[in-house]
């Protein structure tokens, strides 16, 4: 399997305004856009190529709408996902409760999907610790219970963003190394949505 290309479908889930799009912008474009984002309708797609060992990994990232009215549509996008980054706002306790909803959805519909819990806007806590509304230890206990990994991130400063996506890729490659793969089972990069590709592999 040396030098094999690996495609991984990754879905971003979470309540609206938790910062899913900002997270993707920071990872793919290494930028933080100031000002209000236009709400995602349905889902936005972007792909980024990276290297894990001697493998070329393409993360196909689906940034789904957080509004409850798009719930049914979101299910279309996370079908077949190998990894899900479930986001919540560290300053909004209701967003963590909403994250639990998405975890239940994934567990019932995509049992093989690896879940990563992602607390966002950690920079706001650096400014004022009293703004925290989601206790780290409570989330860690929950993550342990559902066998998920936990990251607290800031799209503004870039804290732990690259580490999160790197871990997603490394975990999938590790799992793939123990499986007999006769064909690509990752994201179909020909799907509609005007895919854009960004590479961080350098030869």
From Swiss-Prot:
Put simply, this protein is called: Ras-related protein Rab-24
Instruction: Choose any GO biological process term that the UniProt entry carries and state it.
Output: meiotic nuclear division
Query: Which residues of this UniProt protein bind Mg(2+)?
Result: 21, 40, 63
Cofactor(s) recorded for this entry are: Mg(2+)
Q: Entry's PROSITE patterns? A: RAB
Q: What class of enzyme is it?
A: hydrolase
Concerning InterPro entries, the annotation shows: P-loop_NTPase, Rab24, Small_GTP-bd, Small_GTPase
Q: What is its main location?
A: cytoplasm
Q: Which residues carry this modification: Phosphotyrosine?
A: 17, 172
- Write out the catalysed reaction: GTP + H2O = GDP + phosphate + H(+)
**Can you provide one Gene Ontology molecular function annotated for this UniProt record?**
GTP binding
- Extract the ranges annotated as region (Switch II): 63-80
Where a lipid (S-geranylgeranyl cysteine) is covalently attached, the residues are 200-201
Q: Which CDD domains match?
A: Rab24 (cd04118)
User: Known EC number(s)?
Assistant: 3.6.5.2
For membrane topology, the record states: Lipid-anchor
Q: How is the quaternary structure described?
A: Interacts with ZFYVE20. Does not interact with the GDP dissociation inhibitors ARHGDIA and ARHGDIB.
Q: Please state where this protein is localized.
A: Cytoplasm, Cytosol; Membrane; Cytoplasmic vesicle, Autophagosome membrane; Cytoplasm, Perinuclear region
Q: Which gene encodes it?
A: Rab24
Q: What is known of its domains?
A: Switch I, switch II and the interswitch regions are characteristic of Rab GTPases and mediate the interactions with Rab downstream effectors. The switch regions undergo conformational changes upon nucleotide binding which drive interaction with specific sets of effector proteins, with most effectors only binding to GTP-bound Rab.
Give the activity regulation note: Regulated by guanine nucleotide exchange factors (GEFs) which promote the exchange of bound GDP for free GTP. Regulated by GTPase activating proteins (GAPs) which increase the GTP hydrolysis activity. Inhibited by GDP dissociation inhibitors (GDIs).
């Amino acid at each position: 399997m040396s030098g094999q290309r690996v495609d991984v479908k990754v879905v971003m889930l979470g309540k609206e305004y938790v910062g899913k799009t900002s997270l993707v912008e920071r990872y793919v474009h290494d930028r933080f856009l100031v000002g209000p984002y236009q709400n995602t309708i349905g889902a936005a797609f972007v792909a980024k190529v990276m290297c894990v060992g001697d493998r070329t990994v393409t993360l196909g990232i689906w940034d789904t709408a957080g509004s409850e009215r798009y719930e049914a549509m979101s299910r279309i996008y996370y079908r077949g996902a190998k990894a899900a980054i479930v986001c919540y706002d560290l300053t909004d306790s209701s967003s963590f409760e909403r994250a639990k909803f998405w975890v239940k959805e994934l567990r019932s519909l995509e049992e093989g999907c690896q879940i990563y819990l992602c607390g966002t806007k950690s920079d706001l806590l650096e400014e004022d610790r009293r703004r925290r509304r989601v206790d780290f230890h409570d989330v860690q206990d929950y993550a342990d219970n559902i066998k998920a990994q936990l990251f607290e991130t800031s799209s503004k400063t870039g804290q732990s963003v690259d580490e999160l996506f790197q871990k997603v890729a490394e975990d999938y490659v590790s799992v793939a190394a123990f499986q007999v793969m006769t064909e690509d089972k990752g994201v179909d990069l020909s799907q509609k949505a005007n895919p854009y590709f960004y590479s961080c592999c350098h030869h």
